[in-house]
From Swiss-Prot:
<dbReference type="GO" id="GO:0003991">
    <property type="term" value="F:acetylglutamate kinase activity"/>
</dbReference>
<comment type="function">
    <text>Catalyzes the ATP-dependent phosphorylation of N-acetyl-L-glutamate.</text>
</comment>
<feature type="binding site">
    <location>
        <position position="195"/>
    </location>
    <ligand>
        <name>substrate</name>
    </ligand>
</feature>
<keyword id="KW-0028">Amino-acid biosynthesis</keyword>
<feature type="site" description="Transition state stabilizer">
    <location>
        <position position="33"/>
    </location>
</feature>
<keyword id="KW-0067">ATP-binding</keyword>
<keyword id="KW-0418">Kinase</keyword>
<dbReference type="InterPro" id="IPR041727">
    <property type="entry name" value="NAGK-C"/>
</dbReference>
<dbReference type="GO" id="GO:0005737">
    <property type="term" value="C:cytoplasm"/>
</dbReference>
<feature type="binding site">
    <location>
        <begin position="68"/>
        <end position="69"/>
    </location>
    <ligand>
        <name>substrate</name>
    </ligand>
</feature>
<feature type="binding site">
    <location>
        <position position="90"/>
    </location>
    <ligand>
        <name>substrate</name>
    </ligand>
</feature>
<dbReference type="GO" id="GO:0005524">
    <property type="term" value="F:ATP binding"/>
</dbReference>
<keyword id="KW-0055">Arginine biosynthesis</keyword>
<keyword id="KW-0547">Nucleotide-binding</keyword>
<dbReference type="InterPro" id="IPR001057">
    <property type="entry name" value="Glu/AcGlu_kinase"/>
</dbReference>
<dbReference type="GO" id="GO:0006526">
    <property type="term" value="P:L-arginine biosynthetic process"/>
</dbReference>
<dbReference type="Pfam" id="PF00696">
    <property type="entry name" value="AA_kinase"/>
</dbReference>
Length: 300
C-alpha cells in the first residue's frame, strides 16, 4: 500500500506525538477491562486486538480482563434459564454457573485469544481457576430498610469477590512475552467456582501487579459533569465530591469505585474510556487528548 504525501505526513505526526508516551511506558504493565460495544462490533474487535499487539511490540505489557454478560444472557435465554439480578449482579446458581464458565472461559475467552494471535500477538487464555490465579470468596449481599432491626442477607449464589491474585503466574507470562487474557471466574478455598464482576477483577489484578494503568472500556465518552461535558482529568478527591453531589450515580458507581480502589491501592492512574471509538486504547495512552477520563491520586 502506497500512502499519499498528506497521509504519510499525518502518520509521521501521529508517531511523533506517540514517541514520548511509548518511552514513558516501556516495561510498564497496563490492565485493560475489555467489554461493552468494543466486544460486539467486528471493526472495534479488530482494532482492539491490533492495539494490544502494538503495545506489546513496543515493550508495554498489556493484561486483558474481559466481560461477557450479554453473551451469558443470550445462552441462558436459549437454554430457557431465567436470568435474575440483585443490585445489578446476576444471581448465579449451579446451573447458571455452568453456563458462565462455558461462555466466559470457553467461547468469549478463546475468541479474544484467537483474535489477538491472528494479528501477531502471543495471547494465552486463563480463568481465575488456572493455577489459583484468582482466589475468591462468596460475596455477601445485605439489604436494609427502615423497618428492619437487622439487615436482610440475600443469597445470590456463586457470585464472588477477589481475595488474592497469583501475581507470580502473571509476571512469568508477561515477562515471557505472552499477553494474558483473563476470564473473571474465581476459585474458592473449597474449589467452588465464583462468577465475579469483570471490572472488580481488573481492578484487583491491576492493584496486585502495581500496574501503571487500569483502563476500563465503557459505552460512554467518559465521566461527565451535570452539563454533559466530559471530565478529562480528575483526582480521587474530585471523584469523591462528584459522587457526594450526585453527579456520578447509578450503574457507573461500581465502575468508579473500582477505579478509585485501584488508584488508592497503588495503580498510577485509572481511565474510563470510550470503547465505541476505534483504537480507543492507543488514543488514550499515546495521544495528548485521549478519549475518556483519567483518574489519579494527585490533586488537580
Amino acid at each position: 500500500m502506497t500512502l499519499s504525501r498528506d497521509a504519510a505526513i499525518q502518520v509521521a505526526q501521529v508517531l511523533s506525538e506517540a514517541l514520548p508516551y511509548i518511552r514513558r511506558f516501556v516495561g510498564k504493565t497496563l490492565v485493560i477491562k475489555y467489554g461493552g460495544n468494543a466486544m460486539e462490533s467486528d471493526e472495534l474487535k479488530t482494532g482492539f486486538a491490533r492495539d494490544i499487539v502494538l503495545m506489546k511490540a513496543v515493550g508495554i505489557h498489556p493484561v486483558v480482563v474481559h466481560g461477557g454478560g450479554p453473551q451469558i444472557g443470550d445462552l441462558l435465554k436459549r437454554l430457557s434459564i431465567e436470568s435474575r439480578f440483585v443490585d445489578g449482579m446476576r444471581v448465579t446458581d449451579a446451573q447458571t454457573m455452568d453456563v458462565v464458565e462455558m461462555v466466559l472461559g470457553g467461547q468469549v475467552n478463546k475468541d479474544i485469544v484467537n483474535l489477538i494471535n491472528r494479528h501477531g500477538g502471543s495471547a494465552i487464555g486463563l480463568t481465575g481457576k488456572d493455577a489459583g490465579l484468582i482466589r475468591a470468596k462468596k460475596l455477601k449481599v445485605t439489604r436494609q430498610t427502615p423497618e428492619m432491626t437487622q439487615p436482610e442477607i440475600i443469597d445470590i449464589g456463586q457470585v464472588g469477590e477477589v481475595e488474592s491474585v497469583n501475581t507470580e503466574l502473571l509476571n512469568m507470562l508477561v515477562q515471557g512475552d505472552f499477553i494474558p487474557v483473563i476470564a473473571p471466574i474465581g476459585v474458592g478455598a473449597d474449589g467452588e467456582s465464583y462468577n465475579i464482576n469483570a471490572d472488580l477483577v481488573a481492578g484487583k489484578v491491576a492493584e496486585a501487579l502495581k500496574a501503571e494503568k487500569l483502563m476500563l472500556l465503557t459505552n460512554i465518552a467518559g465521566l461527565m459533569d451535570k452539563e454533559g461535558r466530559v471530565l478529562t482529568g480528575l483526582s480521587t478527591e474530585q471523584v469523591d465530591a462528584l459522587i457526594a453531589d450526585g453527579t456520578i450515580y447509578g450503574g457507573m458507581l461500581p465502575k468508579i469505585r473500582c477505579a478509585l480502589d485501584a488508584v488508592q491501592g497503588g495503580v498510577t492512574s485509572a481511565h474510563i474510556i470510550d470503547g465505541r471509538v476505534p483504537n480507543a486504547v492507543l488514543l488514550e495512552i499515546f495521544t495528548d487528548t485521549g478519549v475518556g477520563t483519567l483518574i489519579t491520586n494527585r490533586q488537580g
